[in-house]
Every structure is written in structure tokens, then in C-alpha cells.
Amino acid sequence: MRIPRGTYRGIEEGTHWHNYTFYSYNKLNSLFRPRLSYELACFIEDHGWEAVAHYPAVPEGNGTTSEPLRDGIPPDIVCSVRIIAAGCGLGEIGFSKVFLTKEFGPRVRLGLIFTDCELEPDPIIHTGDICLHCGACARECPGNAIPSVKDVNKRITVSLGDTSVWYGDVRMGRCTLSHHGMNNECSPFLKKEFPNMAFDVRSSEMTEEEAYIMSYTMAQGTWGRKPDTNKVMGYYDYIMTHTGYFAICGAKGCIRACMDMLEKTDRIENKFHNRFYYKKSWALPNKPEKVSDGVNPYREEYLDKTYPGIRENEYKKTE
């Protein structure tokens, strides 16, 4: 299912984040696209063939839900919808691991149906038929999650019958931290709440699981001194309440930069009258905005503002 290009405009302009979460990511995957899978499954079964609509997901990770069927075989298997789509000839897994089609480039979400109906296969699209391997995705990724295209040791190769395809070995911990708003460079909301955090996602060694734990704990956390709802990250909680998810980075490298390069080089069919980029993309500095002095800056700033002069001679620094 296509992702409208306009759903990236708000984040690109730094003005509106909801559209990406709703129309590009969570609700496109969980509401709009499954309806197509359902209708297609019904169409197949109307013709006498069984159809199993498969929701793109991840396998259970705690390892305690069931015993393996046999040694070496995990008990809970979820298929990679991107690898299967590549094997079906729908497109190519780009270097950033985002799926690309000849019509829309990276602006697609995938569904999957298993069926006993025999279908004529499409030819597999080879690595590099769509992806330019230009490195734009890696250069523009705010989390430094995508390796250099020149690093042959950072590639994942998958065999699809007689054909092998490859893509970059993405650092999913860094990707998840950026995607879920734990990167000051691409989240004005984190920068507002934690202006001095200066957590360098680009060099983080966090695993994907650790990144998820940190992101969701922060997004759903509360703190008694926060006004109104006491939410640590007010916007993250707000958008999760409305959409059930929160996506903050807006795929700056893996989709936006990739899309722009594919459009400029006529690699994809969906054309536009105007270029996506018309000015340099914004980025926030990761360094602290203001390093406060004092024993307890929070308390001292509050007292100075509320009761001017009350702290006079409270304590003095000595050299």
C-alpha cells in the first residue's frame, strides 16, 4: 500500500508530527492496509482457495512461551514480510533495509497472504535494480544507524532460490532510539523536556530491546512535579493516546533522503511537479543548551523567580 508523500511534509518542515504516525506508519499498517489484505483473502477464498492473511509483526522475544518443536527451531515464528515480498518479485530491499518498489520507491507498506492457490511468480528484482547505493540514507540518518555502503562487512545476504540479495546491517538500537524520539537531533520534544541530556545516539551500543524499553518507559512515564498530566514526555503520551503509537524521526534517511534521490534520478515511476526538498533539512544540536550552576538549579531557579532575594547569602562559592 502506498504512503502519500505529503505525510512526510509536516516533519520535514518541523511543524506537524501526527500525519507520519497515522498515515505513514501505525494506522496505515494496522487499520488501512489490513482491510486490503482481508478483501483479497476473501476474493481468493471466493474462488475455492484457502487464504491466510498474515499481519507483519515480530516474534515473541522472551523465550518462555512454548517449547521448540525440535532443537534449533524457535517455537514462535513470524515471517519477514520484506524478504517474502522480495522473493515474490514485488521490489527490492534497499540498502537501509526499507523495501523499495519501482512505482513508489520506499513509500510502501506491505501485507502478506499465504494460500494454496498456485500463482505464476514474478521475476526477482536484483540488488541495485532500484536502490542506487548512493549512501544518502546513511548520510542523512540522524542516529547513524545505517552503515557505509562501502563497508562490505556490514551487509546481510539472503538467498531467494537461486538468487542472492543483500542490504545493510542496520544498527537497530540506534534506529529505534531515533524512531521513538530518544534522539535530541530529530526530536524537538525531547530537546524541550531534556535540553541538557546530550545523549549521543550516533555512538550508542544499545540493543533494539534496550532501546524499546528506554523509549516506552520515557514516553509513558510520570513525574509528580510535571504540570497538568504529570507526564514526562507530554507529546509522546498525547500522540499514543490518539493513535496508539508514536513515531518521531519521520524516516529522515531511510525514506525521505532515499525518496528524493530516486525521484531525482528517475528510478521510480511516481512523479511530482515539485521537488520534495526545497531547503536544507533542520537538525537540532545535541550539545546542552545551558549548563546550570548551583547545588539544586531546579529549586534555586524556582525560588529566585517566585521569591526574589530570598536566597541572598544562602551560600557562597569559595575559590
Q: Over which residues does each language-model region extend?
A:
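Generic low-polarity alpha-helical segments
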Residues: 1-2, 146, 317-319
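Short, glycine-/Ser/Thr-/acidic-enriched flexible segments
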Residues: 4, 120, 263-264
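Generic signature of intrinsically disordered, low-complexity segments enriched in small/polar residues
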Residues: 11, 20-28, 102, 117, ...
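Catalytic cores of enzyme domains
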Residues: 22, 26-260, 270-278
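Residues forming anionic-ligand binding surfaces in small-molecule and nucleic-acid pockets
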Residues: 2-23, 114
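C-terminal non-catalytic accessory extensions
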Residues: 255-319
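Short, solvent-exposed secondary-structure capping/transition elements
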Residues: 8-10, 52, 267
